[in-house]
């Protein structure tokens, strides 16, 4: 209910004329046709009440501007009728000695920066007003703003962080995105009233919100969204909103600092360029040479990074496929023809040997290579002939039509995926922001996958990407109770080649920050996952949307050439059945668990061993063939797989065959 324009007692006699001026302006606006909107009435009431209660004389507009609740909108309304009015509406600035040469600039209209918290709150409040809401309460507005994905930072407090002052004394610990509300109310863009507080956008706020939308090139998504066709991704590299990733690095400037991480983008196969993709730390960087095309804005890029996790666990044994794993498991036996050839493939066993210092630039250069593609998923040499491994698995091609004419790419989120109180809005938010279909299903593994749905037959094919999303707090608990290793093992065995591990939140304020950082490092470097890092929910939503566009672009580009030469994607039913079958414990699974108890035997090494020898009996039989040559027995596994180092090979031999 709008407050009544009634006269109040003025604390200072000198301010009676000013108070009367505000009151008369209020009454005159109420008498206009259509009256005065409730939120504007609250704004004028607050201004009038605080003018009446002022303890200092108000002699100019500058003095009036200092009164709490009086923003630029109120100043503009009173400018023509205020006694002794001044054209300068800006807050008074210091005129201390030494400020010579400064120009007395006029007032500058406040417009929030793009993707700032104020920007997101103002646009959200504007959209909700259009949808019929006259006001919003604090938590309701925070939830709606975070669900919009318009802010680069969280609006409400991050529950994964400790209380301010627990780990650092910086005043930044107290800041959240909601802190900008003070600025919005003081500038007259948002009106606040009642207890509990209710927030309403003013007319000035509406015009500012529209200006923000216009400057950002955004449509107003307040109206219902209708999608009639799949997105046009012919030039997606230039159209997508960029993903901004951060590494978890502590610096002297504060508990956490956002720095660069390896960034790659989907490459155009016709463009042969090799830019360097850097991984920056506080003082140094690792330069990855890969066949990728960077985005136009070097600070932000679309990321589908060079995961070394493309092995396909199919064929003879569900853990490791005989064909797809040959380059990494047993090149001397299964791929001897290529054993002496230098390629651009990234084999993570070669990682330590391929880093060379470049002292002149203070950086390190890594010769990147991967059995499967890195950024454009096709990093084999042009001379290498490999029907199945050159590109990712493709849906079947039944006509001469292009990919988007035959198929629709759909993002599938697990129904157990937890986004807190925002879960109900997550699907609509991704759908409205990125114009991509999103559905909820019960996934047997992972938190998100992408399917290609046949537009005529409605058959669903699972594309070669899967995401496991972890909040830093959940990641810490999963490490403690060993769910962490089991979940990663299930991801590796699911048959999809691009494994994305999405870590949400900042671990630095936590006691277990070092454990989380180590887990992220080993997951990416040693185990070949593509580890994506996001500061919070809003960035996670953008990551899902941008990955969907990038995946769509990749399949659109390679469908015409790769559909006849690559493997065929699993149908959704085949994928779920395969994952359900993996839950069954086999003799090889038990053998792998036993091997991982041996010193120096990693998960990758254990998988490599059982790929060669699925049971303990088969391994013992292989040792028996070399009986009498202890040196050869100790090196047998090392010679058959680059994933097994000399120490692990020797220790496994001692466990299985050596006496004593």
UniProtKB/Swiss-Prot annotation:
Keywords: Calcium, Cell cycle, Cell division, DNA damage, DNA recombination, DNA repair, DNA-binding, Endonuclease, Hydrolase, Magnesium, Meiosis, Metal-binding, Mitosis, Nuclease, Nucleus, Repeat. Induction: By DNA-damaging treatments such as high intensity light, UV-C and gamma-radiation. Its cofactor is Mg(2+); Ca(2+). Residues 411-506 form the ERCC4 domain. One of its GO terms (molecular function) is metal ion binding. Disulfide bonds: none annotated. It comes from the Eukaryota. Belongs to the XPF family. This is Crossover junction endonuclease MUS81.
């Amino acid at each position: 209910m709008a407050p009544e324009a009634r006269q109040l007692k003025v604390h200072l006699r000198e301010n009676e004329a000013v108070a009367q001026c505000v009151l008369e302006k209020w009454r005159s606006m109420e008498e206009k046709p259509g009256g005065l909107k409730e939120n504007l009435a609250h704004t004028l009431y607050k201004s009038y009440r605080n003018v009446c209660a002022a303890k200092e004389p108000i002699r100019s507009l500058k003095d009036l501007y200092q009164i709490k609740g009086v923003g630029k909108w109120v100043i503009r309304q009173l400018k023509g009728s205020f006694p002794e009015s001044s054209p300068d509406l800006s807050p008074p600035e210091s005129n201390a000695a030494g400020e010579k040469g400064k120009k007395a600039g006029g007032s500058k209209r406040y417009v929030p920066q793009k993707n700032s918290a104020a920007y997101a709150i103002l646009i959200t409040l504007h959209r909700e007003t259009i949808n019929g809401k006259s006001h919003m309460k604090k938590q309701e507005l925070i939830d709606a703003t975070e669900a919009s994905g318009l802010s680069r930072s969280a609006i409400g407090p991050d529950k994964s962080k400790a209380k301010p002052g627990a780990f650092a004394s910086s005043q930044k610990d107290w800041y959240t995105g909601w802190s900008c509300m003070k600025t919005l109310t003081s500038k007259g863009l948002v009106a606040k009233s009642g207890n509990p507080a209710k927030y309403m956008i003013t007319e000035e706020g509406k015009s500012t919100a529209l200006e923000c939308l216009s400057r950002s090139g955004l449509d107003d998504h307040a109206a219902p969204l209708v999608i009639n066709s799949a997105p046009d991704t012919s030039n997606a590299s230039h159209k997508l909103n960029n993903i901004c990733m951060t590494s978890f690095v502590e610096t002297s400037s504060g508990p956490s600092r956002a720095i660069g991480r390896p960034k790659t983008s989907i490459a155009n196969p016709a463009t042969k360029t090799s830019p360097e993709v850097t991984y920056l730390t506080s003082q140094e960087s690792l330069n990855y040479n890969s066949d990728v095309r960077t985005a136009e804005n070097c600070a932000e890029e679309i990321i589908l990074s060079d995961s070394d996790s493309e092995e396909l666990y199919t064929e003879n044994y569900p853990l490791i496929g005989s064909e797809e794993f040959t380059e990494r498991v047993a090149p001397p036996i299964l791929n001897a023809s290529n054993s002496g050839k230098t390629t651009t493939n990234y084999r993570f066993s070669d990682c330590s040997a391929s880093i060379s210092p470049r002292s002149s630039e203070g950086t390190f250069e890594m010769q990147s290579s991967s059995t499967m593609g890195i950024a454009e998923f096709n990093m084999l040499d042009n001379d290498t002939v490999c029907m199945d491994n050159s590109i990712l698995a493709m849906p079947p091609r039944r006509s001469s039509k292009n990919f988007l004419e035959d198929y629709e790419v759909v993002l599938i989120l697990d129904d157990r995926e937890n986004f807190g109180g925002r879960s109900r809005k997550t699907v609509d938010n991704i759908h409205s922001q990125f114009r991509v279909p999103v559905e909820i299903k019960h996934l047997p593994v992972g938190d998100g996958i992408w399917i290609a749905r046949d537009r005529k037959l409605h058959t669903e094919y699972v594309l070669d990407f899967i995401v496991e999303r972890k909040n830093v707090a959940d990641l810490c608990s999963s490490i403690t109770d060993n769910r962490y290793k089991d979940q990663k093992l299930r991801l590796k065995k699911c048959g999809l080649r691009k494994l994305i591990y999405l870590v949400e939140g900042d671990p630095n304020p936590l006691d277990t920050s070092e454990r989380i950082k180590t887990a992220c490092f080993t997951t990416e470097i040693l185990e070949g996952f593509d580890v994506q890092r996001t500061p919070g929910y809003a960035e996670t939503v953008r990551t899902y949307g941008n990955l969907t566009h990038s995946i769509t672009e990749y399949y659109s580009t390679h469908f015409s050439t790769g559909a006849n030469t690559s493997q065929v994607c699993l149908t959704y039913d085949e994928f779920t059945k395969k994952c359900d079958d993996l839950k069954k414990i086999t003799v090889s699974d038990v053998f792998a668990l036993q091997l991982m108890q041996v010193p120096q035997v990693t998960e990758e090494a254990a998988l490599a061993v059982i790929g060669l020898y699925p049971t303990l009996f088969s391994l013992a039989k292989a040792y028996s063939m070399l009986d009498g040559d202890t040196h050869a027995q100790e090196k047998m596994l090392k010679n058959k797989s680059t994933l097994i180092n000399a120490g692990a090979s020797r220790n496994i031999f001692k466990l299985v065959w050596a006496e004593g």
